[in-house]
Amino acid sequence: MIKIRITLESKEDVIREILVNPENNLEYLHQSIIKNLKLDEFEMASFYITDSNLDLGEEIPLFDTSEKDGDVITMKNMPISSVLYSKDSKLIYIYDFMNMWRFFVEYLESSEEITEKCTRKLGEIPEKAPDLKFEVECQEEVESYEDMLEDSFDDNEYEY
């Protein structure tokens, strides 16, 4: 078993620590999160692999919604152990894309326990999703859309 901490990104502390079998897939972890946080099981969700700064990487969705089947690795095809295996491994879990609940999921430790369970429960899920600010840092400002287009194309670059 491994111990995993799930933390809601919010002003209030909402934390669950659970023991799970690392050989189960991410869909199983998704269901465990739903159960332990008492969330609606009918909402869409995705895990995102992150780096040490929690920058978003590859999305691992619940379902493949791409035009070609098999183009996307889904939760069902990804073992927990392949993404949560050391103290440095973290995921971001986005639940309910309309309200954008965001959770940090991190590996805590390996455990000799043999039963999956919740080992720590702190706080309750608020009724409304926290307001998250997604800030983008711009290196330089673009004066206008026309300037941006003018800079992007060179008439002499193409043959007619």
Cite the ranges covered by each PLM segment.
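Short linear regulatory motifs enriched in tryptophan with gly/pro/ser
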Residues: 1-160
